[in-house]
């Protein structure tokens, strides 16, 4: 099997690329970072530090790389068996035209072998969104062929991959936690289902997408926002602060109550899942900066993301949400000179006030009780 992976960043190399290469898949990375591309093509290998109670260094080998803006990408899409991405939600739209061109070339060459495309992004149904962008770039006459020959497979991914401390010396070295989870929707594949160690197949993906979003992502974000407010530098420092831990655990329990109601997750198993997440945040070997985790607060406060979506679930089922509200208020306080969204958030609050700003960002009713609660919490910590 041959695969093209868009995104040779830390998550691409440390998570999806590593799983594919470890499974014996012939792997080519596509990226725009020339330093990384040159290093991959010079060495055809890189090292991954897997850190936990026992640290190990794994070597990923047999890889190469192409520039994602080059015609090489188009040619590869016409021949490979799998395309994956780890580029960030915003970049999916940018890579879609190249994917569309590659699919048209594949059709022109008469290659009718099934091709499956999997976006491995921190978003709900990311591949379905990528498919929309790809279809927008296709001519009408090509859409039916793509629909019948190309699988667009949604997935849920989970692995904490902070920036590597040694990246300044070696652009390829990456540090990851031991835990990883890659769950894919088996109902969306074309052709035979692949067998790749570390890839789990399910016919109930949304349950796992929301479990991860409402627990790992919700908890991670709230830890970062409360940690930043309290002057902590890392996620570990923040989660070891008992006041913060209480709110984070409470928020994950509130979002968990939504998951249990919606999908029938087992109470005890979900409680254990929350404990596992908290222990991952405590990992002393991951230097995960609160500012990195908190960046892009406008996206994280949007209706379909990690703070507002679980809150909407609590409103839907009439469940408690006071800790989620505290997390939302902390997100509204997030400031970073290096993050344009943090600056835009600050400007929006300055121009419109916290009530109208939160309503605009989140889609919540400005006059609702929950917005009033969030604004009160925001003002209480101003």
Curated annotation (Swiss-Prot):
SUPFAM superfamilies documented for this protein: 6-phosphogluconate dehydrogenase C-terminal domain-like, NAD(P)-binding Rossmann-fold domains
Q: What reactions does this protein catalyze?
A: D-mannitol 1-phosphate + NAD(+) = beta-D-fructose 6-phosphate + NADH + H(+)
- Where, by residue number, does NAD(+) bind? 3-14
Write the Enzyme Commission number(s) for this entry. 1.1.1.17
Q: Name one GO cellular component term.
A: cytosol
The cross-references to Gene3D superfamilies, in alphabetical order and at most eight, read: N-(1-d-carboxylethyl)-l-norvaline Dehydrogenase, domain 2, NAD(P)-binding Rossmann-like Domain
The enzyme class is oxidoreductase
Q: Which Pfam families match?
A: Mannitol_dh, Mannitol_dh_C
Q: Per its UniProt record, what PROSITE patterns does this chain match?
A: MANNITOL_DHGENASE
Q: Which domain of life is it from?
A: Bacteria
| Single biological process term from Gene Ontology | mannitol catabolic process
Instruction: Give the record's keywords alphabetically.
Output: NAD, Oxidoreductase
* MF GO annotations: mannitol-1-phosphate 5-dehydrogenase activity
Q: Which family does it belong to?
A: Belongs to the mannitol dehydrogenase family.
PANTHER family attached to this UniProt entry: ALTRONATE OXIDOREDUCTASE-RELATED (PTHR30524:SF0), MANNITOL-1-PHOSPHATE 5-DEHYDROGENASE (PTHR30524)
What is the protein's name according to its record?
Mannitol-1-phosphate 5-dehydrogenase
The organism encoding this protein is: Cronobacter sakazakii (strain ATCC BAA-894) (Enterobacter sakazakii)
């Amino acid at each position: 099997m041959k695969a093209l992976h868009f995104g040779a960043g830390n998550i691409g190399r440390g998570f999806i690329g590593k799983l594919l290469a470890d499974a014996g898949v012939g792997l080519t990375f596509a990226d725009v970072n020339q330093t990384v591309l040159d290093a991959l093509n010079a060495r055809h290998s890189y090292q991954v530090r897997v850190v936990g109670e026992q640290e190990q260094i794994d070597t990923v080998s047999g890889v190469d790389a192409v520039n994602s803006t080059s015609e090489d990408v188009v040619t590869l899409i016409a021949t490979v068996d799998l395309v994956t991405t780890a580029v960030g939600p915003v970049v999916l739209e940018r890579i879609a035209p190249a994917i569309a061109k590659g699919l048209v070339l594949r059709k022109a060459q008469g290659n009718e072998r099934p091709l499956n495309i999997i976006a491995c992004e921190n978003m709900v149904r990311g591949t379905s969104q990528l498919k929309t962008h790809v279809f927008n770039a296709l001519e009408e006459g090509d859409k039916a062929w793509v629909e019948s020959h190309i699988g667009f497979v949604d997935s849920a991914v989970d692995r904490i991959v902070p920036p590597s401390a040694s990246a300044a010396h070696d652009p390829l070295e990456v540090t990851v936690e031991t835990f990883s989870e890659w769950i894919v929707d088996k109902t969306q594949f074309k052709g035979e289902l692949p067998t790749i160690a570390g890839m789990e197949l399910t016919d109930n993906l949304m349950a796992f997408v929301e479990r991860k979003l409402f627990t790992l992502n919700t908890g991670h974000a709230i830890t970062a926002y409360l940690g930043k407010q309290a002057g902590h530098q890392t996620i570990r420092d923040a989660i070891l602060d008992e006041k913060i831990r209480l709110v984070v655990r409470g928020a994950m329990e509130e979002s968990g109550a939504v998951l249990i109601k919606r999908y029938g997750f087992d109470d005890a198993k979900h409680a254990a899942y929350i404990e596992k997440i908290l222990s991952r945040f405590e990992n002393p070997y991951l230097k995960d900066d609160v500012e990195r985790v908190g960046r892009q607060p406008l996206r994280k406060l949007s209706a379909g993301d990690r703070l507002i979506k679980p809150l909407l679930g609590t409103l839907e089922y009439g469940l408690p949400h006071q800790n989620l509200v505290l997390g939302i208020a902390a997100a509204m306080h997030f400031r970073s000179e290096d993050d344009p969204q943090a600056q835009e958030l600050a400007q929006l609050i300055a121009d419109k006030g916290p009530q109208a700003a939160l309503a605009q960002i989140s889609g919540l009713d400005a006059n609702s009780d929950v917005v009033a609660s969030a604004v009160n919490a925001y003002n209480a910590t101003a």
